[in-house]
């Protein structure tokens, strides 16, 4: 496995391996969820590139850019075990050199859920991912479904801008107690870590009510919210039932309905989601 920091060097590698690369974009501080993407990437292409870049343009004012966990040596160990050929780890000045002024925005699908509470977030995501696609030239790129809206936004971007690649969404990987794996979990105190289980428990409660015959979104929202509110300190950013394709709101739920939520536990904002009809 090699580590590349230069855009020019990464582009040269990509030219030599064109049509044979799978890309796993990450912000680093890798965990088993990331590793599962890399293992799957290994099955889909001759060469696997994992990008590690804490992208400043997707963080808003007073968000956790400066405190986002970073450990390249740790990341190299996990990536190597997962079969990665190249880590592309540029610095911000490589991706956004002096005078940089071009951004890409997907309008409607990015405007709600995380986009409503994090203005500019998805503009930063789509811009950096489009740049990675141009630099690495993958035939396939893999993303986790924990960031369900991000996946939907990127699918729309790929379609609208005619990127010649496949986007693959992979299932959420969870800890043994149900918490969705996230690099931000390491920022939780032991007490906060226990409280964070309210996200997966609220999903389980809503799905149980759905299996019991409840189809009213308003009623299902009350069931799910009650679990989180019962923990007192966690703060709900959003808890929504949406069409999984358009992400538009619904009045009645069915098996394809997406339950997506964002909850702040202490200073840490966590997200989770599930499709009501899936186990």
Swiss-Prot record:
Catalyzes the condensation of pantoate with beta-alanine in an ATP-dependent reaction via a pantoyl-adenylate intermediate. It catalyses: (R)-pantoate + beta-alanine + ATP = (R)-pantothenate + AMP + diphosphate + H(+). InterPro entries: Pantoate_ligase (IPR003721), Pantoate_ligase_C (IPR042176), Rossmann-like_a/b/a_fold (IPR014729). The reaction proceeds by a bi uni uni bi ping pong mechanism. The active site is at residue 34. Belongs to the pantothenate synthetase family. Homodimer. Keywords: ATP-binding, Cytoplasm, Ligase, Nucleotide-binding, Pantothenate biosynthesis. HAMAP family: PanC (MF_00158). One of its GO terms (molecular function) is ATP binding. CDD domains: PanC. Transmembrane segments: none annotated. It is found in: Cytoplasm. One of its GO terms (biological process) is pantothenate biosynthetic process. Beta-alanine binds at residue 58. ATP binds at residues 27-34, 144-147, 173, 181-184. (R)-pantoate binds at residues 58, 150. This is Pantothenate synthetase. It comes from Citrifermentans bemidjiense (strain ATCC BAA-1014 / DSM 16622 / JCM 12645 / Bem).
